[in-house]
Amino acid sequence: VMLCLTYFMGLLIFYLLTSWLPLLIRETGASMSQASIITALFPLGGGIGVLILGALMDKINPNKVVAVGWLLTGVFVCLVGFSTSSLALMGVMVFIAGSIMNGAQSSMPALAAGFYPTQGRATGVAWMLGIGRFGGILGAFSGAFLMQAQLSFETIFTLLAIPAFLSAIALLIKYRVSKSVPATTDEARSLQKA
């Protein structure tokens, strides 16, 4: 459930921002070309974020790494909202938020694959991916409601940080709960053989 919630929230943020970020930036007084360039920075850093989080997941507990990724995503998404004084600063904040967010989101299938037992792994990951798509749909539509509500740029990005923070909390809950669940007999036997 926590993996599905996290993936849902991640796609909600991603599709809302990739669909509506140019219009939101235009509302701050930027030209359409400036808004398009800044928007392109959001997914651009994803490759960097994936490499960094992937390497960290191999060295540190993957749940904690991805949870921190979501926590930092929330912080930097919020900071985007308060960077309207400078388009260059906004571009940097969007790039960092996109790098971390895309890294955390792209790490989710690997995290899920490590969580589910072998016989149910494909089903578990598929459910997470499928439920996450509904977050993407909701994200694309949510932008219209936020624009219609005429909320400030700062307010919109502060609200957008909430799903990222919820994702971090969900992964920490998943980590705590899965740590307290005893291994099944088959898992215990395989650990004893190793």
Walk through the language-model features, giving the residues of each.
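A membrane-interface helix-boundary motif in multi-pass transporters
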Residues: 147-162
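Helix-to-loop junctions at the C-terminal end of transmembrane segments
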Residues: 50-61, 147
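Extracytoplasmic gate region of multi-pass secondary transporters
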Residues: 1-50
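Multi-pass alpha-helical transporter architecture, strongest
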Residues: 161-188
